[in-house]
């Protein structure tokens, strides 16, 4: 078993090192398998930003020399089996894209943004037997804008909300593989 800390390793190999139900909750944002890097960001092709026309995330990453392959396929069934094995509860972003058990407790993140060309909300499947949750938060710019390491990175405020909504503070063990 691994010591507490951060590990840069294949999550499948890492999860296999832990006993059943070791983590109190796993909060994950796996690839949805929708090829997000190659989606054009917006439908107005005459739009420009800093002299560049509207383009896909993949094009921007290639131009910056940071191109990486991700989101071409969803996680395997084995991934979800292992995730459920090592954690007592789960919060899975993009849960609407996966074949998961029925639940009444979804988390809906209302992005509070007006553009029809972008997703106005994101959905997380949870294993909790609680009412559905709604979190309204704009991360499109201004005071709430955060520097991102990854194009699909969720805002810190969203994770702070999850900690409060699911009473996750108090020294439990949390897993965030992917």
PLM features per residue range, with description:
Residues 1-25:
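SAM-dependent nucleic-acid methyltransferase catalytic core
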Residues 17-28, 32-69, 73-75, 84-178:
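Class I S-adenosyl-L-methionine
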Residues 14, 78-79:
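Short acidic active-site motifs
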């Amino acid at each position: 078993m691994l010591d507490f800390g951060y590990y840069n390793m294949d999550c499948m190999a890492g999860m296999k090192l832990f006993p059943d139900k070791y983590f109190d909750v796993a909060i994950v944002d796996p690839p949805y398998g929708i090829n997000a890097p190659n989606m054009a960001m917006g439908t107005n092709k005459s739009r420009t930003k800093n002299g560049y026309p509207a383009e896909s995330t993949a094009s921007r990453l290639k131009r910056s020399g940071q191109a990486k392959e991700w989101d071409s396929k969803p996680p395997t069934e084995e991934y979800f089996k292992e995730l459920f094995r090592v954690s007592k509860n789960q919060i899975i972003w993009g849960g609407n894209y996966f074949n998961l058990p029925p639940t009444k407790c979804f988390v809906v993140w209302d992005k509070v943004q007006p553009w029809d060309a972008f997703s106005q909300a994101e959905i997380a499947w949870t294993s909790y037997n609680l009412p559905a949750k709604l979190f309204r938060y704009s991360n499109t710019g201004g005071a709430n804008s955060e520097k991102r390491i990854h194009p699909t990175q969720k805002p810190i405020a969203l994770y702070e909300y999850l900690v409060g909504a699911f009473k996750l503070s108090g020294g439990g063990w949390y897993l965030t593989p992917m």
